[in-house]
Amino acid sequence: MAGCDNERTGCGKANGISRRVQIEGITTGVVVDYGIKDAMNMGAAMAPAACELIVSHLSDFGREASYYDRIVTGDLGSVGQKILIDLCRQKGVDISQNHEDCGMKMFDATNQNTGSGGSGCACSATVLSAYYLPKLRSGELKRILFVPT
């Protein structure tokens, strides 16, 4: 999370929010290639790398998935989300209760047929800025693990 210093930047003053959001730590991801070649199935292509990063992060920092209010991915879509949850379970990590996906927040999979994800850069930036940062600043959420797939 990017920090927000209200005294210097005025960030959040317009709506009365004063809580600072800070980066607590990072884990760098790695490429995990399961050989998915279908450009319309980006969720399945990105889920293995997301799983590897989440599991590595939790191990590196000595944390359980429940430490985070939300574990947020970019745009795996509903297909990729199911794969991610299954892969994490296989590695002994249950994220089923606190995983959310920015693409699933931004789009309506039922009416827009967006099941496999793909627009992770746009979804990550937009939903982090417009949805998660305000919830962190207000204190509604305390900690998120942000994995911008």
Describe these PLM feature segments.
Residues 1, 17, 90-130:
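Conserved catalytic cysteine-centered active-site region
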Residues 2-55, 60, 97-104, 113, ...:
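Condensing-enzyme catalytic core mediating Claisen C-C bond formation in acyl metabolism
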Residues 39, 73, 117, 121:
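Glycine- and other small-residue-rich loops at beta-strand/loop junctions that grip anionic moieties
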Residues 64-67, 140:
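Short loop/turn motifs at secondary-structure junctions
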Residues 67-74:
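Short glycine-rich phosphate-binding loop at a beta-alpha junction
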Residues 74-75, 147:
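Short His-Asn-centered micro-motif
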Residues 76-91:
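Short glycine/threonine-rich loop-to-helix capping motif typified by GTGT followed
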Residues 131-138:
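Short basic/hydrophobic patches in alpha-helices and adjacent helix-turn junctions
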